[in-house]
Amino acid sequence: ELLKVEILERHCNYNLKNLKRIVKKLHNLGVVIAIDDFGTGESSLGMLNEIPVDEIKLDRQFIKIHNDSIQDQNVRSLEKIPESVLGLAKRLGKKTLCEGAETQEQVDFLKTVACDTVQGFYFSKPLEEEKFLELL
């Protein structure tokens, strides 16, 4: 579990048979497999049964809904997408990570829908190695 390989969702349909073979080999080596940008590609939900992934990384577009330009009624309606996807991932036994959190409101929302891990500029922008080491 020291190494994680991320597969972009849009690449899952190119050669499914080959991808399944590679993922199986990586799993046998103890590599964690994640699907990145989940929900932005053209693959079906059935793909989650086809490819044995450990983690689903929900694309940031699904949490961008929390901003001042969207009316409250629309926010409540749009919240159902990440809530449903994260719930499905949990029921399938997958870990979840949501990308792109920039505000406290977004982080709070992701806590309420039980997202395992949250990443984004709210916590830190990309850092040079020296600055990163200072944080440790």
Per-region residue spans from a language model:
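EAL-family c-di-GMP phosphodiesterase catalytic domain
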Residues: L2-L16, L29-L136
